């Protein structure tokens, strides 16, 4: 393909897996299938835009017709890295291979870590267990407001979260506490992927989170394709939690979002900008609101809503644009527990330039093939891992 694309748009539907990976059992996952099981649960998904692109051509999804002439190139990608969390998935998409998984704490954090937090802050720690943020806020929020104790909790991910009422622990103090936690959990025995500040406001029984969440991630251990793009003078516009996932590395502009639909609004606004490089959008609600909470109906509704916004996206794309839709792991809301699931992820690659539509690409054996393709397009340093499929897009 002679001309390169001026803009590449990578959209990550957080946790929207498309069927059990070959090594799923190693991760404790059996018969998991995020997309497939959601579709079955609701008696078929209505996602005509994704259908036209070729979603059911990857493998049939109840309710979504297989496209006779798919508009996009399509396949699925298999994760190579040793993990099934957000950071591992995104870092691999941008060209890294993660051998040592981030640590998880399904029984809460060790006393040693909790003691360090209490000594440093002069505040007691309450909670210290895996929990949904909204539930633990409802359960312990009143005690926190009365005592000033910090609500510390985790999830199925490698994460330490601290929830605090903005009138009890001022934002600046909460951020300082999280920065301290970040410093002491960079290496073994903790090796945590993220520390998250989770401020909230309101009265007992009606606490609500504020948009002042802040993530303190580990920096990627090697440069990613994003760094290569930035170093090559290209734009890297991070939308949603992308900047947090990469701790700002390789990002030239960061746009925060409040929800999937706000994320789509921001993305559509970015499409109106004149830039040369990559936009990178994460839609986290699929995972945070519906996957972990095991809510297949809510998840289905969110997928349908996303599909509805693709009409606006497609209208704004020109022959200079390449749109890549994928995911970072699975999170089957019909499965037991609350953890992510080890799955293949969909890959749909579209440009109005493809006048004859798309066709099937080879199965990708690492998410890094996506990053390699972006690097290849912009003629910047190729990642150590990944094989570009740019030449297959005709």
Swiss-Prot record:
Domain of life of the source: Bacteria
Binding site for Mn(2+) 2: 287, 292, 340
GO CC annotations on file: cytosol
Cofactor binding remark: Binds 2 manganese ions.
Keywords, alphabetical: Cytoplasm, Isomerase, Manganese, Metal-binding
CC cofactor: Mn(2+)
Top-level class of the enzyme under EC nomenclature: isomerase
Binding positions for Mn(2+) 1 per the UniProt entry: 14, 328-329
Single Gene Ontology MF annotation: magnesium ion binding
Keyword Metal-binding: yes
Biological process annotations from GO: 2-deoxyribose 1-phosphate catabolic process; 5-phosphoribose 1-diphosphate biosynthetic process; metabolic compound salvage; nucleotide metabolic process
Reactions accelerated catalytically: 2-deoxy-alpha-D-ribose 1-phosphate = 2-deoxy-D-ribose 5-phosphate; alpha-D-ribose 1-phosphate = D-ribose 5-phosphate
Official protein name in the record: Phosphopentomutase
Key word NAD present: no
Family (UniProt): Belongs to the phosphopentomutase family.
Gene3D superfamilies: Alkaline Phosphatase, subunit A, Phosphopentomutase
């Amino acid at each position: 393909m002679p001309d390169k694309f001026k803009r590449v748009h990578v959209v990550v539907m957080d946790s929207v897996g498309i069927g059990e990976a070959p090594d799923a059992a190693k991760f404790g996952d059996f018969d998991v299938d995020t997309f497939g099981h959601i579709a079955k649960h609701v008696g078929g998904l209505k996602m005509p835009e994704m259908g036209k692109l070729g979603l059911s051509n990857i493998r049939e999804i109840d309710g979504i017709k297989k496209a006779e002439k798919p508009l996009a190139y399509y396949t699925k990608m298999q994760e190579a890295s040793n993990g099934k969390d957000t950071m591992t998935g995104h870092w691999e998409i941008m060209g890294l291979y993660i051998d040592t998984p981030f640590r998880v704490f399904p029984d809460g954090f060790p006393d040693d870590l909790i003691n360090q937090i209490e000594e440093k802050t002069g505040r007691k720690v309450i909670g210290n267990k895996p929990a949904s943020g909204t539930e633990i806020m409802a359960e312990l929020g009143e005690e926190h407001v009365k005592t000033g104790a910090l609500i510390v909790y985790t999830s199925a991910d490698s994460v330490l979260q601290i929830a605090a009422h903005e009138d009890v622990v001022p934002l600046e103090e909460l951020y300082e506490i999280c920065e301290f936690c970040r410093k002491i959990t960079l290496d073994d025995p903790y090796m945590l992927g993220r520390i998250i500040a989770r401020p909230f406001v309101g009265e007992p029984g009606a606490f609500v989170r504020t948009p002042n969440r802040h993530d303190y991630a580990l920096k990627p251990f090697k440069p990613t394709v994003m760094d290569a793009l930035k170093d090559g003078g290209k734009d890297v516009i991070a939308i949603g939690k992308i900047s947090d996932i990469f701790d700002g590395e390789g990002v030239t502009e960061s746009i925060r979002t409040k929800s999937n639909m706000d994320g789509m609004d921001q993305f559509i606004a970015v499409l109106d900008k004149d830039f040369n490089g990559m936009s990178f959008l994460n839609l986290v609600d699929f995972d945070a609101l519906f996957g972990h909470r095991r809510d297949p109906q809510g998840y289905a509704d969110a997928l349908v809503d996303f599909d509805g916004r693709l009409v606006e996206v497609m209208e704004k794309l020109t022959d200079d644009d390449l749109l890549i839709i994928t995911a970072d792991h699975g999170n089957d809301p019909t499965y037991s527990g609350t953890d992510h699931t080890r799955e293949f992820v969909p890959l749909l690659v579209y440009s109005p330039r493809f006048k004859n539509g798309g066709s099937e690409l080879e199965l990708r054996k690492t998410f890094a093939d996506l990053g390699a393709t972006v690097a290849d397009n912009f003629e910047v340093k190729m990642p150590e891992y990944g094989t570009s499929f740019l030449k297959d897009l005709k």
